[in-house]
């Protein structure tokens, strides 16, 4: 009994002690002010009339100064300042923050030990800083872009209104700041958002190893920013040019004008100069000019004598929309010699282009009429040793014409016309005309379209053409001052028989698949054409296609088959097309225009194929077949075949295949073969094969790769150009690159083989810095072929 009472007394004592402790705890909780349990929040005035929101665990006021401690959070407009300790002056808006300071404004984030900042003006200073600034860049297919912000660390940062930062003793990168692949160390840097990043006394480091010192460097820091200054130097090696070193200066004085001027030192050749100007002074006017030249010492030949191949090329382009519907266009091109282009063109495709064309014209189209004034010049280089060329010039030229117009609404009769007046010139090894040969032409026409029911169409066109040339060729093929006139009558009938159609419905048995419907069509076409009145074809000087009109009596016939696919409610798309056509000539001599023993080129022939096939009288043209397979997606195929019934063989084979079998893989193959030389029977009377055979052609271009120039990860591309006839590898390229999140590296090997003029091996390397540019001599904007 005594033990039970003792246990009960002990339990009572414990209960009283617990009650006392709980009571004291409750009273102490009631004694704590609310401000001690949560952050104090107040609204403070600023110097410019704005309002700053301040919250902290503890804060007090001393005159104009508010002092806050503990999780301090200060908001003013779009800016935010967080710190352990903040002193704010509501008269001047000056703020001092210390301890774990965080500053945020739009896409700017800074962390510092101490900050002096004016919330009203946005000006401040930061000490012991690391931060990020998000810089938006405009998409660029030739520039590696990264979504990473600009990271930097600095001893001191000054911020100025207008989003301008002056950074001292800093490093800058867009890589992972803990493991940066590259960094810029700069004694001083200026960052102007949506403008530029400028570095003073900087050095570039790769994996923390200093590689390049720059006294001053700038880079764009916005979507539409152009910054004047020197570009990244160009360094490389070539088997024919030697060691290459160059640089260029970019100048953008206004928002509508920029220019680039640069030069390269070529240790084995001399020096090259480049220039480019772009301008858009008005909304509808654009101007561009480019120049490239080489002062070449030349390479030594087998006798030890240097053979210079230098020269220059330039191009001027102007496109402007003028008042009252006028448009003015200039495309002026100048090339000093084909040898220069073959020797110094950057790519194989540029090197083998032997044509230089220039045009200046003003045009106005109104109410179905067209008025044009032009100056044209076409120079085609033929050989390089000796250098020969053909020059064709139209200066000046005025043309006036109209489309078919119907003056009577109830009658299907349409009228139109073409006319021109110009001065023309031709210069080659055989013909050299005066500087200006006058020429005029007027050609009215009438067109009558007829429809038999709704399934058969007939369109007839009749035209009269009168043409006068101020000079002509005499019987010896020499230019004479005798004027010549041509009056031709032209008639054509275009027959459109009904299109044959058949539908195939392959309805899917699965409800989750779209219904597929196919349509197969056969479209026949027959065109008859008759031209008479060209009685002296050999007397006309070949200035352009106008001089190649001949008498003809011909019919062209053929058909086009198409296969369409319609999936669900989508629009139909063409999967396959196959066109076959041929011409029959009732007059095999074309009014006596055919010349035996030479290639004949005029309108009645080259309207079928661009390759000469008539070396004597012909009744039949080659049969032309054009097949296009375009299912979309993984592959596209086109093949052109030309079969000559006179020679009983395929004379032209052209094949183009584009494949994208999987993911980022792609391949393009183009093969072309031409064998259209005459047979013995082409020459009347039959004789051994003449010496006028046109060159054979059998070439292939192949390009395959994975990825793209600016894709993240591993990318590669390889291509060749091979000439089967000459058994020559004309062009070869191998390019491999790897792009990371903030940088990339690329290697390239090129070989260009142009016979005795140029056989060159090029080795290129580039280091790509995301959002900035490329170090090295590999320029992604260059075309491979």
Task: Label the model's feature ranges.
Residues 42-47, 53-56, 69-85, 98-112, ...:
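Interaction modules related to DNA damage response and DNA replication/repair
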Residues 57-60, 88, 158, 706:
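Short, exposed beta-strand/loop patches in secreted or surface proteins that constitute
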Residues 41-48, 243, 629:
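Extended, small-residue-rich solenoid/repeat segments and analogous flexible loops
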